[in-house]
Swiss-Prot record:
Keywords, alphabetical: Ribonucleoprotein, Ribosomal protein, RNA-binding, rRNA-binding
A Pfam family this chain is assigned to: Ribosomal_L11
InterPro entries, A to Z: Ribosomal_uL11 (IPR000911), Ribosomal_uL11_C (IPR020783), Ribosomal_uL11_C_sf (IPR036769), Ribosomal_uL11_CS (IPR020785), Ribosomal_uL11_N (IPR020784), Ribosomal_uL11_N_sf (IPR036796)
Entries under SMART domains matching the protein: RL11
Keyword rRNA-binding attached: yes
Organism: Methanopyrus kandleri (strain AV19 / DSM 6324 / JCM 9639 / NBRC 100938)
NCBIfam families listed in its UniProt record: PRK01143.1
GO MF, one annotated term: large ribosomal subunit rRNA binding
Protein's recorded name: Large ribosomal subunit protein uL11
Length: 166
C-alpha cells in the first residue's frame, strides 16, 4: 500500500482547503475537507502559532493520518508575549520580557523536541532563543540568566516544576 506524505506549516486551528493544503492533497484523492477538519481539531490549542503538520495518505484506500509537530520555540515565545515579531537588532532592541516561570513552561512544552536531558538545560536552550529574539527574562539579558541557572539561583523553582511532573 503506497503512502504519500505532505508536510505543511499551518496557523493553529485555521487550516482551510486553499493553498498550501488543497493543491498538495487534491491529486491524492483524499477528502480535503475531512483532512482540514482533523488538522483544525488537532491544532486548536496552538491558535496564532505556525504549526508543522504532516499528512500521511494511503493512496489506495484514501485513508489519512494527521501528525502535528510542535510549533517553533520562537512562535511559542511570541505567543507568550503577545507580540508579532522578534527584534530586528536583538542586541540593541528589547521586544518583551518573560518571567522564569514562562521560560520553564515553554521548556516543558518543547522538551521532547529539544536535545536537553533535563529541565534546566531545556530552559537554557529556550533562553538562547530569547537572546536571538531581543527578549529579556526577569528584566535581564538571557545570557545572565543562563549563568544564574548554572550558579543554582533558580534551583527552587526548577524543583517545584520537577515535583509537579512526578
Amino acid at each position: 500500500m503506497p503512502k504519500e506524505e505532505v508536510e505543511v506549516l499551518i496557523e493553529g486551528g485555521k487550516a482551510d482547503p486553499g493553498p498550501p493544503l488543497g493543491p498538495a492533497l487534491g491529486p491524492l484523492g483524499v477528502n480535503i475537507q475531512e483532512v482540514v477538519e482533523e488538522i483544525n481539531r488537532k491544532t486548536k490549542d496552538f491558535k496564532g502559532m505556525e504549526v508543522p503538520v504532516k499528512i500521511i495518505v494511503d493512496t489506495e484506500t484514501r485513508e489519512f493520518e494527521v501528525k502535528v509537530g510542535s510549533p517553533p520555540t520562537s512562535a511559542i515565545i511570541k505567543s507568550e508575549l503577545g507580540i508579532d515579531k522578534g527584534a530586528h537588532e536583538p542586541r540593541h532592541e528589547t521586544v518583551g520580557d518573560l518571567s522564569m516561570e514562562q521560560v520553564i513552561k515553554i521548556a516543558k512544552m518543547k522538551f521532547d523536541d529539544l536535545l536537553s536531558y533535563d529541565l534546566k538545560t531545556a530552559a537554557k536552550e529556550i533562553l538562547g532563543t530569547c537572546g536571538s529574539m531581543g527578549v529579556t527574562v526577569e528584566g535581564k539579558d538571557p545570557k545572565e540568566v543562563q549563568k544564574e541557572i548554572d550558579e543554582g539561583k533558580w534551583d527552587d523553582l526548577f524543583e517545584k516544576y520537577e515535583e509537579e511532573e512526578e
